[in-house]
Amino acid sequence: EWLEELFKDIGADVVVSGGQTMNPSTDDILNAVMATPAKTVFVLPNNKNIIMAAEQSINLAEGREVRVLQTKTIPQGISAMLMFDETADANENQMAMMEAAENVETAQVTFAARDSEIEGVPIKQGEIMGLCNGKIKYTGNDIKDIAYKSAVKVFKKNQSSIITVIYGADTTEADAEEVKNRLAEKCGDEVESSIVNGGQPIYYFIISVE
């Protein structure tokens, strides 16, 4: 999967696959920690539902110092990874990586795996959901429209300057281009926008705004 390759290309020693419906366990994370050659290991959960499992690995990893960064989305994880500096100490890296992550807003588009009610919003199985920084803000049937609305919701005028539309296995480059062009028109010429083939399952779009 492209996103796994990306994380490895920017310096990750081990990538544990996960997603909305298949979150890795503490054992999965612990095995990944022990598979790295480093004495100090940074764990980037990139999903709020994985943070607790990651934190449980801290006391179980013998001979390793484990630091769990509170990254809640894949774009936050990418920005944090790009700030890692091999010449800096662990504290400096942790501060720089978290500062980078906190500057990233994330819109995600997925579907409901079953009928449910989330934060008081009734959702039917198969319905499209737009998440803004992990919270459901939009539901409906039009994937591209929900992607656009969700990204606009997290865009900060006069602060945001880069929009990256990462499209998944069940979406096309043409769809991503259409979403990107609508966002570019809405957000203005000073914003740099691009599309990336993420190939990820479950999420039709993951949109990074920073």
Stretches found by the model and what they are:
Residues 1-210:
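N-terminal loops that bind phosphate or other acidic moieties
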